[in-house]
A protein has these predicted regions:
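FabD-like malonyl-/acyl-CoA
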Residues: 1-139, 267-297
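Alpha/beta catalytic cores of group-transfer enzymes, especially the acyltransferase/condensing modules
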Residues: 10-12, 37-42, 98-248
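Non-catalytic positions within long, well-ordered alpha-helices that form the structural scaffold/packing
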Residues: 75, 180, 258-264
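Short glycine-rich catalytic loops that host catalytic nucleophiles or stabilize transition states
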Residues: 189-192, 261, 294
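Short, flexible loop segments at boundaries between secondary-structure elements
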Residues: 229, 289-310
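Amphipathic coiled-coil/heptad-repeat helices and related helical stalk/stem segments
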Residues: 252-253
C-alpha cells in the first residue's frame, strides 16, 4: 500500500468537530492545546455559541488544530504516509504532518493567515463561484474577457469538471455569465467567501512574508505536494516563498492528485472534516482507494479495512 494523506481546507467546518478525538486521545489533546491564541479554541471549535466559526480568522486555526490533532493520532497508530498535501489552508496541516511546522506553529500561523486574509478582503465587494463542466482553457478566456470589470481569476482547479473562480463580484458574475454561454453546466455562487487565491490577496502574502522571517522551519520528513505547483517542491525552492505565493495564486488540486497517481499512490486518506477531497479523488483517480476521516470510529473502520486488504 502506498498512502497519501490529504488535509481539507476551510468550508466543511462545523461546531463539535474534533470533540470525540479530543476526549479519546491524549495525543490529539496535546497537539490541539499547544497554541496560544487570542480566543478560546475549545469554545469556538466544539460549541461556537457566538457563531464565529465560519469567519475565516476563526475557521483557519480551528481547522488546523483539528488536523494536527488527527495527525498526532495517525502517528500514534503507526500510519506512515508516503506523501502529504492539503487544499489551500490544508497545506499548513500537511506541512505540520511532514515535520516542517510544529503543531503550535501551524495553528498559530493559521490564525495569522486567517486574519491577514480577512483584512485583505475588507472593503472589497467580492465573491467566488464554482463552475461545472467547462474546460479550464475556455474558462480562462471568460475570466480574461470579464476582467474589464475588475479582478477575476480561476482560483481552484479541483477536479475534472469542477473549477472555482474568484475576485471582485461584478467581474466574477460576468465571467460566470460568459461561462454559461460557453457551455458550463452550472455556475454556483459560494456563500461567505473572500477573493481567496487571487491577486487581491497580495496584502495577505506580504503579511505572511514578514511573519515567516521570524519562523524556524523544520526539515521535511515526508514529501509535500504544493498547491501552487501541483507537485513536489523543486530543488532550491523556498517553503516560505511557496506559501506566500499560495495565498494569492491558484490551487492546482487536480494536478496534485494526478501527480500522486503518477507517483504510484494507491490509497488516499482525507483528514476532514467533510469529504470534499474524497469526491475530487474519485473523479480524478477512480482506481485509487479513498476514505475520509472525521471521527475516531471512522478512523478505526478505515484502518481495519485497509489492514484486511494486505
Amino acid at each position: 500500500m502506498k498512502l497519501a494523506v490529504l488535509y481539507a481546507g476551510q468550508g466543511a467546518q462545523h461546531p463539535g468537530m474534533g470533540r470525540e478525538f479530543y476526549e479519546d486521545f491524549s495525543a490529539f489533546r496535546a497537539a490541539f492545546d499547544s497554541a496560544a491564541l487570542e480566543f478560546d479554541l475549545h469554545r469556538v471549535c466544539f460549541e461556537d455559541p457566538d457563531g464565529v466559526l465560519n469567519q475565516t480568522e476563526y475557521t483557519q486555526p480551528c481547522m488546523v488544530a483539528f488536523a494536527c490533532g488527527v495527525s498526532a493520532v495517525l502517528a500514534e497508530k503507526g500510519v506512515q504516509p508516503s506523501y502529504v498535501a492539503g487544499l489551500s489552508l490544508g497545506e499548513y496541516s500537511a506541512l505540520e504532518a511532514a515535520g516542517v511546522f510544529t503543531a503550535k506553529q501551524a495553528i498559530e500561523l493559521a490564525a495569522y493567515r486567517g486574519k491577514a486574509m480577512a483584512d485583505a478582503a475588507k472593503g472589497i465587494d467580492c465573491g467566488m463561484t464554482a463552475v461545472l463542466n467547462l474546460d479550464r482553457d475556455a474558462l480562462a478566456v471568460c475570466c480574461e474577457e470579464a476582467s474589464a470589470l475588475g479582478c477575476v481569476q480561476i482560483c481552484n482547479y479541483n477536479c475534472p469538471g469542477q473549477l472555482v473562480i474568484g475576485g471582485e463580484k461584478a467581474a466574477v458574475d460576468k465571467a460566470a455569465e460568459l461561462a454559461k454561454a460557453a457551455g458550463a453546466r452550472r455556475c454556483i455562487p459560494l456563500k461567505g467567501s473572500g477573493p481567496f487565491h487571487t491577486r487581491l490577496m497580495a496584502p495577505a502574502g506580504d503579511a505572511l512574508a514578514k511573519r515567516f522571517e521570524t519562523e524556524a522551519f523544520g526539515e521535511m520528513q515526508v514529501p509535500v505536494l504544493f498547491n501552487c505547483l501541483g507537485r513536489e517542491m523543486p530543488d532550491g525552492s523556498s517553503i516560505p516563498a511557496l506559501l506566500v505565493k499560495q495565498v494569492q495564486s491558484s490551487v492546482y488540486m487536480e494536478d496534485t492528485l494526478r501527480r500522486l497517481g503518477q507517483l504510484g499512490v494507491d490509497h488516499i486518506l482525507e483528514v476532514g472534516p467533510g469529504n470534499a477531497l474524497s469526491g475530487f479523488v474519485k473523479k480524478t483517480l477512480p482506481g485509487v482507494v479513498c476514505a475520509s476521516v472525521e471521527t475516531p470510529a471512522q478512523l478505526d473502520a478505515v484502518l481495519t479495512a485497509w489492514k484486511e486488504e494486505q
